Amino acid sequence: MPETETKTGGLPYHEIRFPYDPRRRSVWKAICRYLQPWVASDEGLLELGAGYGEFSREICAARKWALEQNGALVQHWAVSVTPLIQSAMDPWPLADRSLGTVFASNFFEHFTLEQGEEILTQAARVLRPGGRLIVVQPNFRLEPRRYFDDYTHRTAYTDNGFRDFLRALGWEIAHAEPRFLPFTMKNRLPTAEWLVRTYLALPFRPRAGQFLIVAEKPGSLK
C-alpha cells in the first residue's frame, strides 16, 4: 500500500486503483507456486505493502507477517498472517536475523530512492544471512507510457536499475526476470490458475510489464 493514503475525505487509494477482486486469488495461487522454490517454507516471512494479502495467504512459510498501513484491508487476510499496521518507514517490530524471506510486490516505486534504501536496510536487518528478498516491480523499460498513470508512483525502476541499486547496497542477485508479469491486473486478462501457470511457463511472456528479482543477503551485510 502506498504511503500516500488520502487525507482529505476522498476515496482511499485501493478503492480508486485496485478495488477488491476475488478473481485475483487464483492468479496469486499460480504466482506463489512459481515463487515457492525461493521461499523457505520452514522459516518466517514478511510481506511489505500487503494490500489484500493475496501473496501471504497463498505462500507457504512457517510464520507469516504482513506490513500494511491501511488497517481496513486486514479483513481480507488469512488468519495465519500476523498484521503489522504501520508505515514501512517506521521501525519494524521484528528481531534481527529472524526471517528467511522478505517479499514486496508493486511497492518500492511508491517511495523515493532514499526511502527505498532505508526500507532495504530494514529488510537486511530482519533477514538471516542467506535470506532472500523477492521483489516484483513495474518495469519502466517495458512500460514507460503507463508507469506514472498511478499518481502515487514516485520512482521509476527498470530491471537493470533495480539490480544495480541492490548491488550498491551490498545484496547479491540470485535470480532476475525482466519480463515476469503483465503490467497490471486491471484489465480483461484471463485469471484462471492454470492459464497463469501456463503464462509463467512461457519462454517469452507477451504483454509482460513487471520484473522479478530475487536477491540474497550475504553474511557481510548487516
Tell me the role of every PLM-derived stretch:
Residues F107:
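Conserved sequence/active-site signature of Rossmann-fold short-chain dehydrogenase/reductase
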